[in-house]
Amino acid sequence: MLLVVSPAKNLDFEKHSNAPSSSQPELLEHSQQLIDRSRKLSPAQIGSLMKISDKLAGLNADRFAAWHTPFTDENAKQAVLAFNGDVYGGLDAASFSEQDFSYAQKHMRILSGLYGLLKPLDLMQAYRLEMGTKLDTERGTNLYQFWGNIITEKLNQALAEQGDNVLVNLASSEYFTAVKPKALDGEIIEPVFKDFKNGQYKIISFYAKKARGLMARYIIQNKVSDVAKLRDFDTAGYRFSEEQSAGNKLVFLRDEQ
């Protein structure tokens, strides 16, 4: 079973990494092309392209300028510990055992606008480049065109290496759009998390993101290899709904918090 998640906008390069080892991203030559292109943008252009404040635009211009290889433990950090958003709050990789890190390295991948696809222990330097960014390159007018089939091919390689053909999609639609399902050598399982509010169960973004991280943690810590076992997920009050689930979509419900 291979699981994929989105990255996060918020980053944490301050806290010490407790990971037992590190690895190198496999698509850095493509990342370098995006960095070279992004360095040609002024802070004002970055702000306009990413729809962010002047302060953030300046920060990201500085990040593009500072980005350099080779990545080391001194100038970079393992991706699963560097990302710091809602999904990663649920995942809580800082509390992983060495065994958890080892399992995650084989069974988890992080989609990224800059790095394409990351293993949890891949070193990365700080950046902000969301997959939906309309950055024009020699390959097209956006990052989906830039990455083309590259991410899907890497996922197929990871699926083959870890031993079955099940891919659990815990990523947002913005990021999973970079994957080409028809070219994927696997069955896509899509967990959906709904919370009860105002008389009905619905997807509430903050809770759903955290739940995706909790599900990723559940898969990693329990070494889940059977799709049926995903239905046993009951962390933080969620429960599987046979009634609302259909096909490869597994729906989990939670009563009002």
Curated annotation (Swiss-Prot):
Specify the taxonomic lineage: Bacteria, Pseudomonadati, Pseudomonadota, Gammaproteobacteria, Alteromonadales
What protein name applies here?
Answer: UPF0246 protein Patl_3620
Cellular-component GO terms for this entry: cytosol
Q: Tell me, which GO biological process terms does this entry list?
A: response to hydroperoxide
Q: Which InterPro entries match?
A: YaaA
Query: Which family does the similarity line name?
Result: Belongs to the UPF0246 family.
HAMAP family the record matches: UPF0246
Organism listed in the record = Pseudoalteromonas atlantica (strain T6c / ATCC BAA-1087)
